[in-house]
Amino acid sequence: MVWQRPDGRKPYELRPINFHTKFTRFAPGSVLTICGETKVLCTVSVAESVPKFLAGSGKGWLTAEYRMLPSATQQRHERELLKLSGRTQEIQRLIGRSLRAAIDFEALGERTLTVDADVLQADAGTRTAAITGGFVALAEAISQLLQRGVLERSPLCGQVAAVSVGLLEQEAYLDLNYIEDVAATVDFNVVMNKNLGIIEVQGTAEEGSFSRTQLNQLLDCAETGIQQLLIAQQKAITDWDELFVGK
């Protein structure tokens, strides 16, 4: 039996993706990322300091925080006040690791970039939307730092995007929504760079197992989506050619 996508998309088709830049007033970088019905506000703040282990090194740092509004899902969930859940800690570490692959920390100097990803509405794919939108917010923040003369040269040496894929009825599907995420027997989160090099793969079988052939199908599916996301990011970053210093 062939899986029928609830929104009528083809197996390798992304949900509509939109980046609303300069979304908030005070953060140097702020982007509302809308991926289908998933909405994530990504902001980037800059501090003129680094963690102790980097003090005096001349290098900067990037870290990330991730939260969900209590009403982001159908049933309200409690705010994480005193202790973060394991899921939240895992996701924000993933966001930080992924976006650090895009930065030349020597060019950044002894500064810390903090990426805040706040989920306003969740229909699956929140962590991948946070990474993809977080990169656009990161570029926006770097652009502002260059315009203000804080940075002499751009530290944006990489481009990063992420997407979810999964097996439904033993076939690969791109960019799962919540209904599909629940139904999938295997689901992956894949992070890649501009050259389609793999930064991170998170994958698990919810029941049973999957073959090497299916693994390759899932990665091919993710690659197709990430190619489109990379193009969408560049279109959203108005001064992309001046900012990007990588290959």
Swiss-Prot record:
InterPro entries associated with the record: ExoRNase_PH_dom1, ExoRNase_PH_dom2, ExoRNase_PH_dom2_sf, PNPase/RNase_PH_dom_sf, Ribosomal_Su5_D2-typ_SF, RNase_PH, RNase_PH_bac-type, RNase_PH_CS
Pfam families: RNase_PH, RNase_PH_C
Signal peptide coordinates: none
Alphabetical UniProt keywords: Nucleotidyltransferase, RNA-binding, rRNA processing, Transferase, tRNA processing, tRNA-binding
Single GO term (MF): tRNA nucleotidyltransferase activity
Residues at which phosphate binds: 87, 125-127
Record's catalysed reaction(s): tRNA(n+1) + phosphate = tRNA(n) + a ribonucleoside 5'-diphosphate
Gene3D superfamilies per the UniProt record, alphabetical: GHMP Kinase, N-terminal domain
The keyword Nucleotidyltransferase is annotated on this UniProt entry: yes
EC number: 2.7.7.56
GO BP of this protein: rRNA catabolic process; rRNA processing; tRNA processing
Family: Belongs to the RNase PH family.
Job description of the protein: Phosphorolytic 3'-5' exoribonuclease that plays an important role in tRNA 3'-end maturation. Removes nucleotide residues following the 3'-CCA terminus of tRNAs; can also add nucleotides to the ends of RNA molecules by using nucleoside diphosphates as substrates, but this may not be physiologically important. Probably plays a role in initiation of 16S rRNA degradation (leading to ribosome degradation) during starvation.
Matches recorded under HAMAP family: RNase_PH
Subunit and partners: Homohexameric ring arranged as a trimer of dimers.
PANTHER family linked to this entry: EXOSOME COMPLEX COMPONENT, EXOSOME COMPLEX COMPONENT RRP41
Name used for this protein in its record: Ribonuclease PH
Organism expressing this protein natively: Trichormus variabilis (strain ATCC 29413 / PCC 7937) (Anabaena variabilis)
Phylogenetic lineage: Bacteria, Bacillati, Cyanobacteriota, Cyanophyceae, Nostocales
